[in-house]
Amino acid sequence: MTINVNTNVSAMTAQRYLTKATGELNTSMERLSSGNRINSAKDDAAGLQISNRLTAQSRGLDVAMRNANDGISIAQTAEGAMNESTSILQRMRDLALQSANGTNSASERQALNEESVALQDELNRIAETTSFGGRKLLNGSFGEASFQIGSSSGEAIIMGLTSVRADDFRMGGQSFIAEQPKTKEWGVPPTARDLKFEFTKKDGEAVVLDIIAKDGDDIEELATYINGQTDLFKASVDQEGKLQIFVAEPNIEGNFNISGGLATELGLNGGPGVKTTVQDIDITSVGGSQNAVGIIDAALKYVDSQRADLGAKQNRLSHSISNLSNIQENVEASKSRIKDTDFAKETTQLTKSQILQQAGTSILAQAKQLPNSAISLLQ
């Protein structure tokens, strides 16, 4: 064994291993204290890139879930207001049916109409005041809104809200009134029993309806018979004995053509009708009350269709949230496997590094004493 004092190779070797053990000890302590296996790019460059992408996706999913919940909140707010609007329309329908009864006097019908007008005002108030985050939902100004329900661009759904004001054209339709009044003694002539209705629906479907009325039916029986043949429009009789037809707004596009011998007998003409909405309802007369029922039925159908659409959107958003939550769970699990510290493994590494550090320190101390052997040779 060579003994020298200029170069202590043993000490240098011990110091190298001590430095390595200390570095590993520091790394283990950093990982255990931070909880992250990757604390800088030098720990795992590829793993850092992957974990950062997964972090961005997870954060995006978290925001998307909040966005979806906001969409549900808007839908719930609008649907709750529409529920109250439905209750108002149901009450107005009750009033119209009550007013159509022949036992009511003019003053009684006027009282019923006053309540109906007050309900129309409340219908408008609900439409104008229902809002979410400062945006009006049911007065027609909301239009459509896009809800970002994904962690990447383009992952959105569109929710639209329309007006449910009493004067909205979709809350009604068109009315057609015969020119010739008929008394109770009148009956459908055997030579003029045919009625033909031709019109186009909003969805583009062409409708041709041929009706052969019953010979001898009076005007009220005729209205009942027509209603039994179709649900696309409603027939009723006003206080003067005139047949009136009401067509809900979604069921007609353009002219409503009426022809046939019975149409001529009644003076029932087609063409563009008189547009009527819930705002135009007047139940101070039998005819107005009868027509009001058709208008309100059309309005109820319209509001119900809007509520159904909102319900479908809520269900879609709820399923979207469940899916986003599942994706986020798996993304976080993947990120954890890449970036998080395995405490069992790292604790073992810490113990190993501590032992090696202690051993290295002890060996280095002994190695530093080796040059002293040269002094003993000089004595």
From Swiss-Prot:
| InterPro entries xrefs | Flagellin (IPR001492), Flagellin_C (IPR046358), Flagellin_C_sub2 (IPR042187), Flagellin_hook_IN_motif (IPR010810), Flagellin_N (IPR001029)
Q: GO molecular function, one example?
A: structural molecule activity
* A GO CC term assigned to this protein in UniProt: extracellular region
List where in the cell it is found: Secreted; Bacterial flagellum
Provide the primary localization.
Answer: secreted
Q: Record keywords: Secreted included?
A: yes
Name of one Pfam family that matches = Flagellin_N
Keywords, A to Z? Bacterial flagellum, Coiled coil, Secreted, Virulence
Query: Where would one find coiled-coil regions in this protein?
Result: 104-129, 314-341
Q: Determine if Coiled coil is one of this entry's keywords.
A: yes
Superkingdom is Bacteria
Q: How does it assemble?
A: Heteromer of multiple flagellin subunits including FlaA, FlaB, FlaC, FlaD and FlaE.
Further information: V.cholerae is able to differentially regulate the flagellins within the flagellum maybe to produce flagella which are particularly suited for motility within a given environment. A flagellar filament composed exclusively of FlaA is fragile and easily broken.
**Annotated family:** Belongs to the bacterial flagellin family.
The record describes the protein's role as: Flagellin is the subunit protein which polymerizes to form the filaments of bacterial flagella. FlaA is required to form a core or scaffold into which the other flagellins are inserted to provide structural integrity. Essential for flagellar synthesis and motility; important for full virulence.
Q: What is this protein called?
A: Flagellin A
Species the sequence originates in: Vibrio cholerae serotype O1 (strain ATCC 39315 / El Tor Inaba N16961)
